[in-house]
């Protein structure tokens, strides 16, 4: 269990948020904002919501998604992290994309876990692509993954691309079959991978 929120029945009552004390500070930080987002977005006075690590069959997946996105935006506003990602992306090359290093850096900056950072980078893949492609930060279109799918937009996250690069190098180390230079292409990102792994 991550936390519980009790939404007040009326203005005379207080909302209540309970967090799992066995979780670390950074986990409680995120879960607290997750529960706060429920208070701000669930319009059902008197409701109690129990939040677990994964959405359970009896939970509304949209409400949980909204609370996760809300907590991430409270703690790591996209207008703050996109410039950091762009600055860090200048160090990416054909041999490495140190997304996991970036995750550690952002984790420390925003007092959240690296998992939260990686989920945020993944959920902002389309927005990151827009920003890295030169779109002004105030003109970026925010769009859920389901909306992207409806519109035929398919953008690999930077984490996915780094994992593909890692897998290619791992396979080379295991088989010693030379890697042919190739490109990772995902409609929007193009990264060249050389025949050498570092």
Regions found by a protein language model. Name each.
Residues 1-198:
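Active-site hotspot residues in diverse enzymes, especially metal/ion-binding acidic/histidine motifs
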